[in-house]
Amino acid sequence: MAFELALNALASSTHKDSSLNPVLNSAVQPLQTSLQNFPWIIGKEHLPFLLAAGIPTSGFGCNPHPHAVHKVIETFLLFNHWSFMATVQASVMFMKPSKFKKLASVNPNFSELVNYRLTAADSVRYPSTSTSLPKYEIVFMHDALMYFNPSQILDLFIQCPSLQRLHCSLVVPPESSFTDLSLHPNLYTYTISGNTLHYVPEGHHAGSYDQPLDAISWLKLNSIHSPHLNLSVSKLESWGPVHSLLITRGLPHLPSSEKQQVSFHIPNCLPLPEATFLHQPLRHRLVPTEVYDALFTYTRAVRTLRTSDPAGFVRTHSNKPQYSWVTSRAWDNLQTYALLNAPVRPVVLFDFFLSPLKKFQLFMSQHINSLVIKALPFLGLIPPLVKLTTLGFPIPSVSHFQILFFTMIGPSGQFILEAFPSMLHPAISYLESCGLVPRLPPPVAQQLQTMGILRKRSAFSLKTSLSTVKWPSWKITALISALPAALSVFLKTISPLSLQSLHDGYNAHLHPSPFNLSWSLETFHVQSPSPFLPLSLTPPSPSEEIALPPPIFRVPPPLPAQETPSPPAPALVPPTQPPQPQPWEEIISTFLSSLNASSHKPSPSSAPLESPSPIPESFEVLAEAPQHQRSINECGALNQLPLPVPSPLQNSTNPKPPFPSSDLLSDMSCTGPVVEFETIFPAEYHMSNGSFPTRLRGHPRSSAPFPQKHCLLTAVASQLSYTEHQLWEFLCDMLPDSLLTNSEVENFGLSTDHLTCLSYRLHFECIIHTSHSTIPYGIKKASTVIQISYIDGPPKHFKAFIKLAAAAPGSNPSKSNLVRAALRFKYNDAFLPFWDAHQHTISVPHAKNLISNMKNGFDGITSQLSGPSNKSPKMKLLELDATIDVSFPRKCDVIHIAGFPGCGKSHPIQKLLQTPAFRHFRLSVPTNELRSEWKRDLNLPESEVWRLCTWETALFKSSNILVVDEIYKLPRGYLDLILLADPSIQLVIMLGDPLQGEYHSSHPSSSNSRLESETTRLSKYIDCYCWWTYRCPKAVADLFGVKTFNSNEGFIRAVLSHPPNLPNLVNSIATANTMQSLGHHALTISSSQGMTYSDPVTVLLDRHSLLITPQTALVALTRSRSGIYFIGSMYTASGSAGTSYMFSCALTGLPVDMMSAFPLFHTLPLIHEPIRSRRHRLVAGHTPSLHVPPSNKWPHRLHLPPHIPTSHSKDVILAHGIVASNAPERRLTTLHLPPTRLPLHFDLESCNPSTVSTSSTSNSEVPFTHAFLGESFEELAAHFLPAHDPDLKEVTVGDQTSQQFPYLDQPYTLSCQPSSLLAASHKPASDPTLLIFSISKRLRFRASSSPYAFTPNDLILGHLLYTNWCKAFGRCPNSTIPFNPALFAECICLNEYAQLSSKTQATIVSNASRSDPDWRYTVVRIFAKSQHKVNDGSIFGSWKACQTLALMHDFVILTLGPVKKYQRIIDHYDRPNFIYTHCGKTPSELSAWSHSFLKGDAYICNDYTSFDQSQHGEAVIFESLKMHRVGIPRHLIDLHIYLKTNVSTQFGPLTCMRLTGEPGTYDDNTDYNLAVIFSQYVISDHPIMVSGDDSVICGHPPINPNWPAVEKLLHLRFKTEETSLPLFCGYYVGPTGCCRNPFALFAKLMISYDKGNLFETLPSYLYEFSIGHRLGDVVRLLFPDHLLKYYSACWDLFCRKCTASQKLILSFEPIPPSFFSKLASTSRWVSKVLFSDLPTKIRDMLISSSKLPSYHQDPRVQYLESELLTSFNHGRLSTN
């Protein structure tokens, strides 16, 4: 450690190299040895494993190997580990001879090689088979022990008496003892099947092999005992799955009281407890210890814990490569375990200051239950002891009790019978019963009492006596003794756990012990050895060797290999018998059974197959229909079972059916016929929603009861000034009773029909938000608009729509105006046949495939056309091909119109294209013939004919609407290619029929056919398939069972010769050319697709007709309105096997089986008539009182709604509030943070005490009033912008032109051109070239992905800048400040507050990807900043590169952000007063500082060109030294350096440069600028103003003598200016104060004036103007005289346009607070300058009303920083 510190101290000196020379010399030889022994390429992730295993690999190898780590381990085993153990001559078994020679060359003691061919693969490994066993005392067995069991090894020792030591290498995963999943998946994987383990090294499946599963038993043995011999087994070393074992002979067995243990290295993990009463495999409960500990602390440290937070925390770790061994089930178990146990806390008390009595009471209260339970069993010993020691219990009893002369207990007689003999007792009792005693004279009675014969009567008398009760029997005594023990058991069962048990259980379950892979070693007992080899070693004769087949072994033999063992030869298993085909009789029986079941007749399945039952009537009727008993599909296969055939009644003409019968006709509350609602209550309804049937109500208001399911009324009432019952009364006034009370209303609730009725009555428009789209209802363009949400359920429910900040994906699709217009378009009272537009994601590979084939001439003819070299079609294809190479996928709206041939797909679209909304269209068709049809139908003027293109020419034209006819006849990928070729396309309308033919390339080299068929890709966009035709005659339509509107009956005939003047459809191009040469009008069937002929067509049948698909045959049969002539070889349509099925059906008049001929047919959503209404009828009703039993402990927390607002808190299961404070919560809420970002927040509570801020009173003199010459703003603005061509300022690269000076459709009123042309405008949304053209100026790239390496100049210049920066602050460069954890904690709070408050919660939620763990934190996303920067440098300027912003990972912002704030607070104390930085200060403070410090009229101003890009590695060195000075922890400094040297973007890796958006951009730029200034000048007390790259120096300080040498090292380009009127941050500064630059302010006012938002921006610009205006007449001394007219023009505009309340700010009196209140209430936009000076209450009001843009420097954060400055003074920090 001391030597390392010394090297660090010498880092900047020349002595470091000499000091490191011995270190380098000592490393040369080991490095060379490592490269020589291990020359293979090793992944970085494997190097720590190999080094920890003691294998000296360098990682600099360059030879590839499929499993390099295993090769390194094997090499180390052989040439390092085994080589030192061969101390005497030794034998080697199962090794290639070449490898044995290398091993023997290292150690000559390897004398003998013994190999045995035991499998077929061994003949390649081993040239010969050994005929004897090893003969030396030491034997090395290479990678074969897993194929032998202990009894075989015992036999080897018995057969080789000289063998003493057997060294074996064993390849077996130790974790296979309890799981089938590897704990090192990057190193090896394996699977277990039965008793076989399949091992795959490093993903190299070609090198995988099988081995017995019980090979793991070798790692569980320490000895092998047998009656013949004892062997000892020892594990010498382990390298992951490779183990070195030693088996020795004859060691005595020493008995031991403890078993030996063996352990293996595995990842640091612990097992989660099993769920209660559930079995969970151990492998899926193993989780990393560090992740568990961090998650355990996290769930108890956060303020609020949501149900998703543990999963989000796990998400941040699950993708780390070091945790690849953890299974997904284990991660799931971990987050579930953490979530469910988060509320659990240990039940402990820490009372240290209790009195002894209180401690005793506390002890008894905690342990009374356990003490009683433990004491009760001892009470059972008392009854037996008492029975043994005593005869019984003496029990006192009352023998006589007399009260009030009445005897209660004892004898009631007067005579004492005991005084008389027993024989006289009856006589005495008789005398007493006769009443003798009362008759005795008193003297006699008294004498008898004295003698003890007669009892004395008294008022109270009590006599007692003792009686002994004997103990019960021993059985009863035993039962009594067992009662306390039983009571103890009972109390222990029902009593709660003791505190100690709770504490132990808490620690055992929530702090489980680490998992160690270890076990005890056992002894293996062998009764008799098994043969080591399953063959005889006697060499056979040559003849016998040739004649005999190779032996087949029953035992799996050992299989040594070169690198890894190979599997044994698999046993031959006879193939299983394939399933026999089902008998034909059984098929017929099954079919007849299905027919009987459909006709409700008994099934004939019980009848024997030999005598089938008669055909039922239903089958006979079916057989009479004109259908094929055997049909032929498109592949020529026979379908033995007939499929459903379309009904021939499709073309019967039926009138439009009336409204369905309902209760309306019998409803007595209404009158008149059943009509549509909009007929009775006419209005302009949305989407035909007023077309539901109803009748006119004839009775007064209905008395229908209020519905129970009234959620629709509740949703509407919440947004209107009516109650639910009032809305119901409106319905009762308008609708019949049958629409108010019916089964639908009672069971399901109210529908949108009722909503339409209410919308007419109250005249409102309703937007219903469903999970898929938004549907408008009610009156169009109504003044009142309400929003309702529709929940699909169950149960379905209406509720008031709440505009949520975040929504589920796809829940709020945005339909373009074009899509809405297409949905509304009607032709012939019918809508277009589609339901909605679809989002098509462009496939760049499809487009690339097509353009490559076109470029090479394989598809299309464009590449073969000639033209000028720079504008030839070939060159256009090459340019388009280059464009596709750099294109990215995007999405575009597509509408698919599909239907049967002749259904009228094109005609409605032609009418749509004639509407104004669709006039900017372009048509793409596959053939010129089809283009001619469109040209004739559209009848466009000559100037618009270019819009009608064939598919190739359409690629080079542009429009926002694309119509593609016969899309399936175009090459695959054409839609993707044309969308990439023209990014302006907003909507694509595709016309086509997937049942017709598709494109086939005629060139054999075309690879277009390898792509997925377009019928599969694009048919998913089909909403409706029009199952009718206007073209086909009835004869053709009946073939397909499709309805036709053609009144012509038509015909299908066979003729012998070509009818004259008719179109001829042929099968091939060659045939078409031949017929055309003979004078016939001929074309191929494929090229006729999309064409319509009024005359009959001729179809030529030849041998090619057998090859055409049913799709092409459908095209041929559906071209004519009249009929079809077949000519040629009629055999091809004879219906025989192998003939054309479609043409056979046409000639025989049999229906076409659509299911068999077209596999896609059953997936098409058929519609049988045009769409007349787009009305969406929704029904819902939800009763909130319904109780749904919860499924778990927190049902409402674990099931989130599809739309989650940012304030959603029902998923919070724990909320930890402030315990010891009554102050309000100052931390911002974190509920809305994504679960992956929340772990990055510390969420600390600030401990900074509040401070009292005081404001000083200005003692400045009263200013003099201004005196301006009159200047009209409008007149000056009219000639301010010179007339010019904005296009000349744009930049053009290739065929792309920038858009920084747009002037088309821009408003202007002041001059002849828009005022926005004054300066370049950066709008990435409308200028796709902005970022691309700016990359070369704003970004600097490093040559490769390797990290940036600091140069010596970087180190020298970085230290030099740091020294001069310290000089500016008056610091010692070598001094450091102790780190202050309390202040850093406050900076963490401040940084998190800034991150949570700088953007809205919805923005943070939408940017959840910024905390995605899959996003490497060294990758930043560069995007262009949208701004219109207007200053002296940009006004009248040309094209300007945009400012690039770097979007970094939240980890970087939240980790390094506190570091920069900590540095800012520390640096604030040392900064001299004469150095001004503008960060966190207002223009008022700038004016005050200028008035106090600036003097004279000599100033040096400086700005830099490309300041951010000019800071190289020296800036990183400089920043790291600044961080080190204030005591920033080393790991944070290293993180900063690592990020700066490894940053990469979507455009490539960047070199060291400043990125706008990285933490501390402004502070580091300001410090760099300040360090350069003090390097250039010798400054003593010259006032300096610094802000980023802008600076002003008051006076002329002398040049530093070292500056010429320093300047050569810098990469900066200075723009130094000496002036008397300096401009700083847009303000002219001077001794009198500061003033806003009138020139720039005038230009901004012009731009705002032309845009029409002057009244929104006027208050902010007025405030900026008032900063200088309030100085009085001296303001004229701050700016040049030629700017006075602009100042006067601004003054003129403010005087005329501002209100009286706004003009108060221009007075010299203090600004009243009411001014800011009025300003905030009337302003829609507030500039940064104005916002910084507003009071806190006004700022909060602006923030709450969303009038505040996201500023880079939040004044609220700066205010909190100022509080920290006053709370942590620098002197106290330095003394701690």
Swiss-Prot record:
Residue ranges of the Alphavirus-like MT domain? 58-219
What keywords is this UniProt entry annotated with? ATP-binding, Host-virus interaction, Hydrolase, Methyltransferase, Modulation of host ubiquitin pathway by viral deubiquitinase, Modulation of host ubiquitin pathway by virus, Multifunctional enzyme, Nucleotide-binding, Nucleotidyltransferase, Protease, RNA-directed RNA polymerase, Thiol protease, Transferase, Viral RNA replication
Q: Which residues form the (+)RNA virus helicase C-terminal domain?
A: 1027-1159
User: Could you state what the record's PTM comment says about this protein?
Assistant: Specific enzymatic cleavages by the host yield mature proteins.
Site note Cleavage applies to: 806-807, 1180-1181
Per the similarity annotation, which family is this? Belongs to the Tymoviridae non-structural replication polyprotein family.
Q: Which organism is it from?
A: Ononis yellow mosaic virus
Q: What Enzyme Commission number(s) appear in the record?
A: 2.1.1.-, 3.4.22.-, 3.6.4.-, 2.7.7.48
Pfam families this protein is in?
Answer: Peptidase_C21, RdRP_2, Viral_helicase1, Vmethyltransf
This chain's protein is named Non-structural replication polyprotein
Q: Which SUPFAM superfamilies match?
A: DNA/RNA polymerases, P-loop containing nucleoside triphosphate hydrolases
Superkingdom of origin: Viruses
Which residues are ATP-binding?
899-906
Question: For the Peptidase C21 domain, which residue ranges apply?
Answer: 658-812
Q: Catalytic positions?
A: 711, 797
The UniProt GO MF terms for this protein read:
ATP binding; cysteine-type endopeptidase activity; mRNA methyltransferase activity; RNA binding; RNA-directed RNA polymerase activity
